[in-house]
Amino acid sequence: DNNPSGLLVSAKDAQTHARLAIQFFDHTIQRRYVALVWGNFDEDEGTITGNIGRSPKDRQKMFVFADGSDGKHAVTHWKVLKRYGYVTLVECRLETGRTHQIRVHMAWIGHPLFNDERYGGDRILKGTTFAKYRQFIENCFAVMPRHALHARLLGFEHPATHENVLFESPLPADFQSLLTKW
């Protein structure tokens, strides 16, 4: 994904890359994201389990195969951080790391990411007829013209020193500005 803000890890050489890749494969890397999603949750936290693979109808999109017939096993744990009425701020912890995992899983349970055109996070605007609300949403989209996803925390064993390292990143200005509007 090239739209989220926040942390990422990269390797300078093949040996470092191999050591990091093992940690990703073994699911030992800690990754936490903050997302602003549409709708309100009944629960305070939950787990989404559903295989993710390429959509049979649109190869540019990923798709949840709930029956497990295709795709790769994917697990996302989520927790409500704050409710704003029409939108909810959630923290997502990945147990697996599939392409667009948070975006696809959240859309699958009916809570697409704010302003995520690919997975339905812009649909609220298309169905809105109340002019004042429509203008408010358009203004919010202008403040944050990308989907509302931020890689907040990244932890792993350092490939050279074998120390456990943990990095955190505060919400960027556009994300903070968006939250103040709600």
Task: Locate each region found by the language model.
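RNA pseudouridine synthases
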Residues: 2-182
